């Protein structure tokens, strides 16, 4: 039987200082992020789910909570869904007063194809595929939800669709609380990908 594994990016994080939080613990959703999570929970009500998985990070767990509340299912924490590793976490990364102002950090930026600042794309793809198929197997004949993070979701989708992994981060199609759905065939293999933004009306205005 065909299945769909929905990968959801977490909602907006409370981060007034614009810090790269990465895998740091304790980053919670903003009020708007909590609204996004409620919208995603309502969106999920129509689904027939057999598994709900999440990244271990707080922002992902807060995003998945309304989904769990809509379905009588246990929540599984999967380390493979965690944010991409990044040596810059805990710092600002912006022109002017951020990391780009400090030459000692430039050595990490020279080769985005094999990012020296964090987790190699190949490793990211491998663990995200493991997460996808783990959710598939846990769901039985039903669909599944995995709550994760922008870069892991986007790189997984790019690999599946044959897109170049080297990319402009500003052009990723993976907004806050968005849904990237991997549709599987009767053999459990990825057949196609679709994308939607149930919480689009809550997205911050682009500057």
Residues covered by each model-derived region:
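Conserved histidine-centered catalytic loops in small-molecule metabolism enzymes
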Residues: 48-80, 101-107, 183-207
